[in-house]
Amino acid sequence: MPKMKSHRGACKRFKKTASGRVKREKMYGSHNLEKKNRKRTRRIHQSTLVDKTQEKQIKRMILA
């Protein structure tokens, strides 16, 4: 059986942390930032952890 291929789109979007959780960037942070207030843009630029209900599927996609 051939080797499993990782999902390249998921590999670009998610990273595995040292503790084993999956980290992701928040959405709405690439353009039109002048319309959003400073508090919102500051929160957008912080990364967050993936929800535990989706963690198993994403780990399978990135082969972690």
From Swiss-Prot:
The keyword Ribosomal protein applies. GO terms for biological process: translation. Residues 20-42 are annotated as: Disordered. InterPro entries: Ribosomal_bL35 (IPR001706), Ribosomal_bL35-like (IPR021137), Ribosomal_bL35_CS (IPR018265), Ribosomal_bL35_sf (IPR037229). Pfam families: Ribosomal_L35p (PF01632). SUPFAM superfamilies: L35p-like. Keywords: Ribonucleoprotein, Ribosomal protein. HAMAP family: Ribosomal_bL35. Belongs to the bacterial ribosomal protein bL35 family. This is Large ribosomal subunit protein bL35. The gene is rpmI.
